[in-house]
Each structure stands twice: as structure tokens, then as C-alpha cells.
Design a protein with these regions (language model features):
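ATP-dependent carboxylate/acyl-activation modules
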Residues: 1-181
Length: 181
């Protein structure tokens, strides 16, 4: 009826069934194998917290104890050989080298909202330029592909990630910046 391929319908059905199984045990952390599967299938710590009814901190702590942490893959940008442009996954080895340089992490504005101009993005771009001029490695975290801050050459490194606690803490833990703007 919808012309959506059966494969995609089946994948969605499997995710719904996985969510229902997780929600059946409200108030307690899922079994280790269920938590690992949920992370590999794209369930965020925050969403798991909401459907299971336990704190996001509890889920994050258990996930880290199990060694289930984000890895980063490079985005291949047309015309560049080694762009420092990354997205996270729980399904691969980490391919993101980390330097020992002095770094500052800049959090972008995320998705545009009604009434929001580009002023904040302009500030992020100029912060990156000023910090580079001062000798810092600059790291931008943002998820809006229509901003200048997500251009591959604006910062030394770009994480194309949602601005969630899970993602920002994971990047912070990996990069160990001196500060966050």
C-alpha cells in the first residue's frame, strides 16, 4: 500500500518490539545484552531513561561499565582527503585520532528555530577563528548542516552530533578540552 520496501517495515517492527521488551521491565536497568543491543540499534541514553523509568546517569554508568561507548567515523567530504569531520556510532571501531594539543570545544546552536537568526552561528565561527589565532585546536559540536560552523574547514575538528548530554559528554571525555564554549 505504501510502496515502502518490506525490509524497512521489518526493521521498524524489530525496533518497536525491542522498545516494548525494554519497557516491560520499568524501574530497573535492562539486562546487559539488552542494553548493548539497544545502544547498537540507536536508542539514546535519554530515550532509554524515559521508556524504562530509570535515570539517564544510571544508564550511562552501566553502559560505560560494559565498555559500550561511542566511536567516531569520518565523513568523507567531497574534494578533501582527510577532513576532520566525524559522526558517532556504537557499531564500529573508533577511527578518530586525538591530539595532545591545547583544545577548546565550541557547542553550536543545533537546529534552527523560528525567530532565530544566524547570529549565534556567526559567534561560533568567530570564536573558532579567534581561538585558532591564539594557538588552540578548535572542536565544534553541531548538528545543523546549513550553518557555516559545520563547514569542514571552520574548525580543526567537527563532530556532527546532536547537542545532547550523552554526545557532548562522550566527546568531552575523548578530546579532553581545556574548556567548553
Amino acid at each position: 500500500i505504501t510502496a515502502v520496501k518490506k525490509y524497512f517495515i521489518e526493521q521498524m517492527k524489530e525496533l518497536v518490539e525491542e522498545e516494548e521488551a525494554l519497557a516491560a521491565n520499568k524501574g530497573q536497568l535492562p539486562a546487559d545484552n539488552a542494553l548493548i543491543s539497544a545502544k547498537k540499534n540507536g536508542f539514546s541514553d535519554k530515550y532509554l531513561s524515559q521508556i524504562i523509568g530509570v535515570s539517564e546517569d544510571s544508564i550511562r554508568e552501566r553502559r560505560i561499565e560494559l565498555g559500550v561507548e561511542e566511536a567516531w567515523e569520518g565523513v568523507h567530504v567531497s574534494g578533501t582527503e582527510d577532513s576532520a569531520y566525524y559522526y558517532s556510532t556504537y557499531n564500529a571501531e573508533d577511527k578518530n585520532p586525538v591530539s595532545e594539543n591545547k583544545k577548546i570545544m565550541i557547542l553550536g546552536g543545533g537546529p534552527n528555530r523560528i525567530g532565530q537568526g544566524i547570529e549565534f552561528d556567526y559567534c561560533c565561527v568567530h570564536a573558532a577563528k579567534a581561538l585558532k589565532a591564539l594557538g588552540f585546536e578548535t572542536i565544534i559540536v553541531n548538528c545543523n548542516p546549513e550553518t557555516v560552523s559545520t563547514d569542514y574547514d571552520t574548525s580543526d575538528k567537527l563532530y556532527f552530533e546532536p547537542l545532547t548530554l550523552e554526545d557532548v559528554l562522550s566527546i568531552y571525555k575523548k578530546e579532553k578540552p581545556l574548556g567548553v564554549i
